[in-house]
Structures are given as structure tokens and as C-alpha cells.
Regions:
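Gram-negative bacterial Sec-dependent N-terminal signal peptides
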Residues: 1-26
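Surface-exposed loop/turn motifs in large extracellular/passenger domains
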Residues: 27-180
Length: 180
């Protein structure tokens, strides 16, 4: 993304500590769209999440959510857990322009994911459409994936659809598994 686009960006910097769900693995996020229609296409956006204990995600779009965006910059860092840049699930639809994603995962038996586009709900198709995507992924754990695009629901017919322009992925996982 060019600097002139970043100058127009609305910066939402969320340094979260302890915000999350009541589940065993709490989540922290920059933007969570669950089951609603959300349009942020008028300006570029930047989301930053740094977690010392929980599982951070830059953007979560779930439960048949519809998210429309302009250019997006995501920076997600985890000190001690897995991390994901963009998580699209449950029949949700994302339509956007260019993305820059930086994800740094914690050490141990944890995954680092740039983009996860999946559908685990019954009879739902998750769709992800973007322009050019640039990722910088660093892991210190067992697995690192640039893009996971798959349906693994157990009830009904599930599907995924992933479309993007040019994709550039730079990855380092401390000598462990890298899947692009």
C-alpha cells in the first residue's frame, strides 16, 4: 500500500490486554463482525493487536457476517499463543481491496495464520474476495500457514470461495513447518 493511501487511513490502534471471551481460550481482536452487515469501504483501515496471553486476530468475520472494506493493514502479535491476521468463517462474506498483513506468533505448539477462510456451519459458504495481498508471517511454533481455504463442517453442505489479485507471502517459522 502506498504512503499516500496510509496518510488517508483512519488509524484504530487497539492495544488489548485481557479483553476476550469467557471461553478457555480467550480471543483479542482489532475488529469483530459477527452476523451483521458492516461497510468500512470509505477509508483505509489499520488494526493492531498485541496479546501477552490470549489468541489475537486482526479481523474476525463470522456468523454470516458481511464485511466490505477498502485497503486494510493488519498487525497481529502474540507473546504466548497462536495468532491469525484475518479469520472469515460461518458463511461470512468479505469483499475488500488490498491487504497488508503482519502476524507474529508465540513460541510453542501454536499455529500462525495469515488468512483463514473456512466454513464450519451447516449449509454455509464463506467467501473472501480481495485485491493484492502482502503477508509477513513469523512463527516460533509448530505450524505456519499463509492461507487456509477449506470447509470442514460436519453438518450439511459447506463451501469456500477465495479470490485475490497478486499474493506475496514472506514466512519464517524458526525451522518448523510452513504451508502456503
Amino acid at each position: 500500500m502506498k504512503m499516500k493511501n496510509l496518510e488517508k487511513a483512519i488509524i484504530l490502534s487497539l492495544m488489548l490486554s485481557g479483553v476476550g471471551s469467557s471461553s478457555a481460550m480467550a480471543l483479542e481482536w482489532g475488529l469483530n463482525n459477527s452476523g451483521t452487515t458492516f461497510d468500512i469501504s470509505e477509508a483505509s483501515k489499520s488494526y493492531s493487536v498485541h496479546s501477552t496471553t490470549d489468541k489475537p486476530m486482526g479481523i474476525i468475520n463470522t456468523n454470516n457476517g458481511i464485511l466490505t472494506a477498502n485497503d486494510i493493514v493488519l498487525e497481529v502479535r502474540s507473546d504466548s499463543n497462536e495468532a491469525a491476521g484475518f479469520f472469515n468463517d460461518g458463511g461470512s462474506v468479505y469483499t475488500g481491496k488490498n491487504m497488508e498483513i503482519t502476524v507474529v506468533g508465540g513460541s510453542g505448539n501454536f499455529m500462525v495464520n495469515g488468512i483463514v477462510n473456512q466454513s464450519t456451519g451447516a449449509n454455509n459458504a464463506s467467501k473472501f474476495t480481495a485485491g493484492n495481498i502482502k503477508m509477513d508471517l513469523t512463527g516460533y511454533g509448530s505450524e505456519l500457514y499463509g492461507i487456509i481455504n477449506g470447509s470442514h463442517g460436519i453438518n450439511g453442505n459447506n463451501a469456500v470461495d477465495f479470490k485475490a489479485g497478486n499474493i506475496t507471502i514472506e514466512a519464517n517459522n524458526d525451522g518448523n513447518l510452513i504451508g502456503i
